[in-house]
From Swiss-Prot:
Gene3D superfamilies in UniProt: 2.40.280.10
Similarity remark: Belongs to the SmpB family.
Annotated NCBIfam families: PRK05422.1, smpB
InterPro entries membership: SmpB, SsrA-bd_prot, SsrA-bd_prot_CS
Primary localization class, coarse: cytoplasm
Gene name tied to this protein: smpB
Source superkingdom: Bacteria
PANTHER family, sorted: SSRA-BINDING PROTEIN, TMRNA-BINDING COMPONENT OF TRANS-TRANSLATION TAGGING COMPLEX
Keywords: Cytoplasm, RNA-binding
Organism (species): Orientia tsutsugamushi (strain Ikeda)
Name recorded for this polypeptide: SsrA-binding protein
Length: 153
């Protein structure tokens, strides 16, 4: 992400459910009413992921709410959206996705400094249940340390 960016939606569960190995930025093909809905914050990318289809990358299962003023020309809220990447980036992603257990997860949607909508993607591997438990224990220990230090001083 560059100097200025306004984050519209984040996938907070992604960091809990996956090990994020690599991050990348991609543009997204939108309709007019989708852009207006994103500006008003009616977006959810909780369970969204990206996958390759015919040498292109698409974003699946992302929700962009309907824009009320668009009337009959409105968009479908859960449609498949094409991501804009260079050919070399697509080939690199396809090569990394061929590794077993790797997934491309949407981490956030934001407006960059040029006011364009961008999607931050993360190349991820799924966490096991014991990894999640360990992460929870670590977070609780850090909170407890902060409480102890706060009470000391």
């Amino acid at each position: 992400m560059e100097n200025y960016c306004k984050i519209v939606a984040q996938n907070r569960k992604a960091k809990f459910n996956y090990f994020i190995e690599d991050k990348m930025e991609a543009g997204i093909v939108l309709q007019g009413s989708e852009l207006k809905s994103i500006r008003s914050g009616k977006v959810s990318i909780e369970d969204s992921y990206a996958a390759e289809s015919s040498n292109e990358i698409f974003l699946y299962n992302s929700y962009i709410g309907e824009y009320k003023q668009a009337n009959r020309f409105n968009h479908v809220p859960r449609r498949v959206r094409k991501l804009l990447l260079h050919r070399k980036e697509i080939q690199k992603i396809i090569g990394k996705l061929s590794v077993q257990g790797c997934t491309l997860v949407a981490l956030s949607i934001y407006f960059n400094s040029k006011n364009k909508v961008k999607v931050e993607l993360g190349l991820a591997k799924g966490k096991k249940q014991y990894d999640k438990r360990y992460a929870i224990k670590e977070q609780e220990w850090k909170k407890q340390q902060a409480r102890i230090m706060r009470n000391k001083f």
